[in-house]
């Protein structure tokens, strides 16, 4: 076993080449305390609900993704932010969309000689308002029964862009692209349920 927790570059948040780069060793507490644009509110809400404070202080965003649990709290938020992940090895670097990285319950594209080094979020996705809701049997120290992360951009009262992701409802968290396509162009003042059902 190799402890990589002391590698500072894995625990930083920076802007590089049009992406916000979140080091895979960034803890949930780090994320909660980081100054980030408004669209990261859902990720901060998520951070405050991962396990206990002790877990938030040592548990990392990269660990949450590599664990590939269907109930991994960070995945729906990162899917809604259109995240990619950076994998490094002695052979070089590769970047995958998050939705291509997690293949199933506890199953990822991570090779034996790779580590997940960073989560990359395009700055063009850093617009809009967000929210994260988690349903569990109790309020704290709970494994999710269901969760949803949503990012919405409005032009007046018209939905110009929306990203909705759910977790704990299947083996892999998913973006609800069909629902998103139905909602884009609709007014928030109308009965959206009529359009959905």
Predicted features and spans:
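C-terminal structural segment of proteins
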Residues: 1-197
């Amino acid at each position: 076993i190799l402890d990589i927790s002391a590698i500072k570059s894995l625990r930083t948040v920076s802007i590089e080449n049009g992406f916000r780069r979140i080091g895979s060793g960034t803890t949930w507490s780090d994320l909660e305390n980081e100054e980030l644009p408004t669209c990261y509110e859902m990720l901060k809400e998520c951070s405050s609900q991962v396990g206990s404070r002790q877990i938030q202080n040592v548990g990392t965003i990269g660990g949450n993704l590599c664990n590939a649990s269907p109930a991994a709290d960070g995945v729906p938020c990162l899917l809604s932010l259109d995240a990619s992940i950076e994998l490094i090895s002695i052979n070089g670097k590769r970047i995958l969309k998050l939705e291509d990285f997690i293949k199933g319950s506890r199953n990822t594209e991570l090779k034996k000689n790779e580590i997940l080094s960073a989560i990359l979020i395009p700055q063009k996705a850093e617009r809009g308002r967000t929210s994260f809701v988690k349903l569990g049997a109790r309020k704290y120290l709970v494994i999710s029964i269901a969760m949803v992360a949503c990012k919405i951009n409005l032009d007046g009262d018209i939905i110009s862009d929306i990203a909705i992701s759910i977790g704990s409802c299947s083996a892999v968290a998913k973006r609800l692209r069909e629902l998103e396509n139905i909602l884009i162009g609709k007014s928030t003042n109308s009965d959206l349920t009529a359009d959905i059902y």
